[in-house]
Amino acid sequence: MVNWQVLYNRKKFQKRQLPQKAAATMELLIAEIEQSGPVRGNWPNYSKLPNNRHHCHIKKGKPTYVAVWEDIGKNKVKLVEIIYAGTHEKAPY
């Protein structure tokens, strides 16, 4: 089975700026995307967004932290880009 490759948008995704709990949860999400692909219906508040984007919550409370990723693979290439991880207020959706 071919795993998915995960890329990072360096401008918008900076894991070191996340709180420790959110960063740890983000690591789990990335591992799951690499193993099983971008559709993660088992994650809290997961939803598929327009333009092949997906999002879920990685830390509840105030502030809430979310992750946004995009399936950018073409012609059966399994490629996902993490485009954002941060507070809900600044999420690109």
Give the positions of each predicted feature.
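Sequence-level motif detector for i,i+2 pairs with an aromatic at +2
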Residues: 1-3, 51, 77
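Arg/Lys-rich, positively charged N-terminal/basic patches that mediate binding to nucleic acids
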Residues: 1-31
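Enriched for short, Lys/Arg-rich terminal
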Residues: 16, 57-93
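A short, surface-exposed loop/turn module that caps and links secondary-structure elements
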Residues: 31-61
